[in-house]
Every structure is written in C-alpha cells, then in structure tokens.
Amino acid sequence: MIEAKQTGAQAPAAASPERPAVVARAFGALPDQSASLALLRTIADETCTPGPFAPRQPLALYGAGNLGRLARDHLRAVGEDFDLVVDRNAEALAAGGGWAGTRLVHPDAVDTEMKRRAMLAVSIVTSPYAPLEAALSAAGWRDIVPFYDIAESFRDRHPLSNGWFAEPFSDNDVAAIGAVLSAWDDDLSRAHHLQFIAWRRLRQEWSFDGAPVTIDDRFFIPQILDVMRPNERFLDAGAHHGSVTARFIAETDGQFASILAIEPDEQSRAVLEQTRGGFPSDQRSRITVSDALLDSERRTVRFHHGLGYASQISPTGTSERATQTLDALGAAPSFVKLHLEGGELGALKGGIATLRKYRPIIVATVYHDADGIQATPAWLMDNLDGYRFLFRLHSWCGTGAVVYAIPEERQ
C-alpha cells in the first residue's frame, strides 16, 4: 500500500473551537489497482461523519472570484446576511462595480476583533483548501469553513449541491466503487478518484505526486485534444453562457460541423444567445440553441430557474417543465459534454441509443451528487463497449470532477 509522505508538519490548528482543521494527506506515488483498493478500504474504515455547517453572524466571505459571486448570490437568495468580502484584489474589485453595495476588504485590513468573532466562509476552490485554512488560522481567523459546507445547510430551499457529504460505505459499496477504480484507464484517474472520495466521505484533502489538479483544461484535457477531429458535431448540454462552446470553437480553430448548445434556464439562455451572436456569421450559422431539459424519460418536473450555474431540476423549483431525452432530440453528436448539476446520469440514460449509435466522445461532470462516486462512471462502463475511461479533477474541495469516455477507435 502507498503510504502518506512524512512532511514533519505539526498537526493543523483547529478551524474553529468546535471542529478540527481539514486533514491533508500527501502520497508520494500514483496508486495502481491494488494500492487504490487498499486506500479505498482505508477511507471506508474511517468512522467520522462530517456534515454541513449552519452559518452564524457575523459572516464573511473569503474570495470574490466566480465562486465568491455565486456565494454572494446564494446567501442573498436564502436570506442570509454577510458583513464583508475579503479579497487581495479588493480595491480593484470595488472600482469595477460588480460588487456595488458590498464591503470589500483586503486581508491585511481586517481587524483582529472581526477575525475573532466572524465565521469565514472560504469561497475559493482553485487552490488547495488545507494550506489556505492554515494560513488564515495563522493570520488570526478563528472560525473557518468551506462555503459549500454552509450552502449544504440550505438544501431545503436552494438546490446548490456542491457541498454534499457521502454516507459511510457498506461492503457492497466498497466492492462497487473498487470495480470502478480498477476499470480506469490510468493510475492518474485512480488518484483523482480517491482524492474526490476522501473529500466527500471524510473532508480530508488528499494529493498524489504526479496527479496535479489542472484548473484550465476542464473538458479539454490532452487525451481529448489528441483525438478530436475536424468537423466534430458538438452537443453542449448545460451550456450556461456559452463558455465551453467558445472553448470548443477555439480548440477546433472554427473547423466544426455543428454545435447544439442546450440551456434550459431562460436567463442563462439569453446570455448564451448573445454569445452565439458574437461569433462570425459562418460559425454562428452552425450553432443551434435549445431550451431542452434533459432527463432519463419524458415527464413533468419542478425546475428551479434563475440561479445561474445552479439552475436545475429540483423540488425547490417554482416552475413546472416537461423534460426531454437526448434520444428524442434526434441529434447525431460526435462529442457530448454534460454539465447538468446532478442530472448527468439521467441524461445519459435517456440517450443510450444515441450514444451507442454515434459513439461520441463523452465528458460529464460528476461532482454534484453521490452518483459521481460510483453510479455514473459504472453506468458508462457497463453500457458503452470499446471505450476507455478517465477521471480528472479540475478544482479542489471535491469539485471539478469530470469523467471522460473516449471511443477506442479514436486512438
């Protein structure tokens, strides 16, 4: 079994008087099949049961980037106040106008009393959490928690689910997860899958030498770029404002056959249409925008709209929508991207005929619910013959997890 590296570091300081800091474990090598199964058993044998944290006042956010803006909007949506936002670029952000009405403060300008009294919700997932938590603790902050762990306490009224916690694993769970670990095409996938599981089950931050978390290549890792061809037919499900569509066009240098960009949220789709309108006419004519709400079958569901990235099928939604299957779209994709806030497995099931007929490259996010640990990758592995499967992390705190399915004939 691979052992965690001995760093000589002292035990981390508590994130608050009530809870310990996040434990970081660094491993010196990538895990092969045997080592990954042993490490999975280590996770399964842990008895801790971490859970969400209700916010308390005064509340501060740390980080004013994309996640910081999402955190701000989420807290406002659930009626939770916050006092300030701490960011090293506070002055420039304040001048930009995107944070009008919000108190933005440089970390060095926060007074000692605020650090002692406030709960600090970290809204950054583009760097490791544990060393940031340790640095904030050393700077005098007394109560530090990942923002997503706070968001999880509002699931009864807001569907944002990126802070979910995995339940303890039974022996059957361990066997099923182990089968997926063994089936990945490379040891890097096993390392990232274990890192994902350790955060979700234990709130431990694992890392492996040779397994960097890459922020900038989500959906377009080298193994995907190596097999992309001219004239791909791209299906972008969960297109949001069109950033992935734009990235696809850039990666193909505009040499694609068609793009079907699917976005069920009206507000996001309006921005998507603007994005489409900004492309040259010869590219714009090959892009179709759809409002389809993908699922495993046609049915009527509640849809929570107006939440930007987090809009999704949810009991908290106030509108009723008819879902549609990928098969019913009549598309013939050669490349399918799914980012559906937990709806990925349902969309895959509703597209089985299309996937088997056209054998596209598939890239799907799997970090929005517990299906990502085993059910979604296992479904792909069980239902698509002649594919190789990879797992990659593109951010920290158990987020940014993507499964990649590449047809063997693309080699």
Predicted features by range, described:
Residues 2-62, 68-82, 88-411:
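Phosphate/nucleotide-binding beta-alpha loop and adjacent structural elements of enzyme active sites
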